[in-house]
């Protein structure tokens, strides 16, 4: 029992250390829902260390050293290593549908329904998750060096992690608020004690 608990503790500590090395883009290109689940999968031996294109070769080498594994080339199935890119919205084509807002893991897109949206270049991790939901195909990825005011490198991992946590908390809070509103509506429509 104690040995199992020690192994779980070591695995948890290793996952935290691995997560500390990951770039926190939360891009899901690794095949996991975010950097933390990927770190946990590496720590327990369920995932290889070469599935993170944003981290590239330098990350793979650091993960190999930390996890005691041999370095591997980046798995091309997960993407290719390249310069930092950011999302850019063609504001003339944006219809303000707001479908790009929820998938952005760090809330780097600002706007309101029925109004033009824009990407805050200094916050964009380059995850590309905003592209697919756009019904008018007005979002494209550009090298950060070609966008005025954009840094050449991705935001620091600790800031991405904090913004990702805040994004998740905001979504949970909104879901709870919507559930409470729905309960009040059902109660108002059906009265107390009457099944909906």
Model-flagged regions — what are they?
Residues 14-25, 44-54, 73-96, 101-102, ...:
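Ferredoxin-like iron-sulfur electron-transfer modules
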Residues 62, 102, 132:
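Surface-exposed charge patches
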């Amino acid at each position: 029992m104690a040995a199992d608990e020690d192994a779980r503790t070591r695995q948890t500590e290793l996952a935290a250390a691995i997560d500390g090395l990951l770039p926190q883009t939360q891009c899901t290109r690794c095949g996991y829902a975010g950097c933390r689940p990927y770190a946990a999968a590496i720590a327990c031996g369920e995932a290889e260390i070469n599935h993170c294109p944003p981290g590239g070769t330098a990350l793979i080498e650091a993960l190999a050293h930390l996890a005691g594994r041999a370095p591997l080339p980046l798995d091309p199935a997960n993407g290719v290593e390249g310069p930092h890119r950011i999302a850019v919205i063609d504001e003339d084509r944006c219809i303000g549908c707001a479908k790009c807002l929820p998938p952005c893991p760090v809330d780097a897109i600002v706007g309101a329904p029925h109004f033009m949206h824009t990407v805050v270049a200094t916050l964009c991790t380059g995850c590309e998750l905003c592209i697919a939901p756009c019904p008018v195909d007005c979002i494209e990825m550009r090298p950060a060096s070609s966008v005025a005011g954009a840094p050449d490198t991705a935001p620091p991992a600790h800031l991405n992690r904090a913004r990702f946590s805040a994004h998740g908390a905001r979504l949970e809070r909104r879901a709870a608020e919507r559930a409470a509103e729905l309960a009040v509506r059902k109660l108002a429509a059906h009265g107390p004690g009457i099944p909906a």
